[in-house]
Amino acid sequence: MLTNLEIARGAKLLPIEEVGRSMGLREERHLEPYGRHVAKVDLCAIEDLSERPKAKYILVSAITPTPLGEGKTTTTVGLGQAFSHIGKRATIAIRQASMGPAFGIKGGAAGGGYSQVVPMERLNLHLTGDLHAVTEAHNMLAAMIDNHLYHGNGLGIEPHSISWRRVMDVNDRSLRNIVIGLGARTDGVPRQSGFDITAASEVMAILALASSLEDLRERLGRIVIGHNREGNPVSAEDVRGAGAMAVILKEAIKPNLMQTLEGTPALVHAGPFGNIATGNSSVVADLIGIRTADYLITEAGFGADMGAERFFNIKCRISGLEPDAAVVVATVRALKAHSGRYQIKAGAPLPEELLEENPQDVLAGAENLKKQIENIKLHGVPAVVAINAFPTDHPSEHKAIEEAAKEVGARCAVCRHFTEGGKGAVELARALEETIEENERERRRGGGGSFRFLYPLEMPLKQKIETIAREVYGAEGVEYDAEALRALEGFERAGFGRLPVCLAKTHLSLSSDPALKGAPRGWKLSVREVRASVGAGFIYPICGQMRTMPGLSAHPAAERIDLDGEGNVVGLF
């Protein structure tokens, strides 16, 4: 089979104006082309399209993934393409790629095989410059903070309390912890700081959650960068940095329009970290996309306990949109890993025994699948399982997954969209169509599921944390470090108690221990500290060790990426 890059490069793409017209977007009013195959979509489209019918809203989530990922983006793309094979129109909405992982071990974020967003080089490298704008806006605030300290510190900011570091879109472990302001007195105030990757910036989370340019400006002003000598929070507005940040982001808030290999419209916008932020694409992309097709399909990072929970309880609160169904992507290899009998490591070959026929291990690991389906249903949303099929799978293993899904009342579809494109996900599209129609019929009869949040915003922060830990992760309790309890009390006093919570934990387990596979029981969630993203609008407790600046592997993808003699990119995947 051809590589992802070879497949993408061989595609015949539609002019982006034609893609926009298929969505009801007008070239002269709504589209700002960036070349022939990418365009920005003006936010006036939200109002202009508001009288059009709403699409059915589908979330693509997954079981707890292995370090290799289980194919959510590929499934999102394949499903979007599949609907056209059954006479329906679809728009997909996905996150923007970060160049750090693209040059690291993870690779790009355009999907794969015959289910990709194209041009894939554009998506994975720069696109329209949104990540650079986020980087510049973030670092502008960092410069304003240090400039304020240098010029007398009129706000009385405690330098040790400053939590606003700098960012860049490169995996570079050597910048995690640095000392700034060294040299002469004129070189600034020395203090310890560091760099995070751009996707971990609160500015990126704000870009994803802002519902308008005005909302973006307000959220930027609410960013808390530290506290003063009296212990009161100091904001980006206080250091007079928010206005300049908004100017830098004025174009970045507009979603990017691209297309799949089969011409399905793709809105590509924002890329917040899935660990410490929502891991979802932007609210504005969904507000536009929901009026452009019969189905709007979006994805959420990592497993249903992570991205989907945040999608439901954070993103949907802001957008006001309610999902009609969710897909839980599962693979045979990941479910075998969840049996606890295999180890999968990023960058290492798969264990040979993992590829042998073993439906018993699939069933053992399927406890994770069943819990993730339950996590979707907790929110009143029906779930359909997508088996992302690999050539090494066996029919008996697919049957084991189908049996596990049936136990918890979920339909199941085997998908081969990686090798077949949209045709390979038609079974999934039909299963979703039937599931949504069935749920609507049940609702009309007084039954069926209705979308609901897991907790009310009035609930105290501590209780919100414990609700997620118990109901979503399956923990029997929560243990707090003293520092975490003090932070929670401080946030309640500061008026942040009505914010939703976004628990930062490993994506490799339902628990906070990446080594615990399946659906572990009898464990307690440990919260060691709690931080606030007040601008983005959530509190994030830290559970376990979180890296916000990745490092490169011994042999990163960057070693293989180059230009050929004709100036074409080679080695990108």
Curated annotation (Swiss-Prot):
Pfam families: FTHFS. The keyword Protease does not apply. It comes from the Bacteria. It catalyses: (6S)-5,6,7,8-tetrahydrofolate + formate + ATP = (6R)-10-formyltetrahydrofolate + ADP + phosphate. Pathway: One-carbon metabolism; tetrahydrofolate interconversion. NCBIfam families: PRK13505.1 (NF010030). This is Formate--tetrahydrofolate ligase 3. It comes from Rubrobacter xylanophilus (strain DSM 9941 / JCM 11954 / NBRC 16129 / PRD-1).
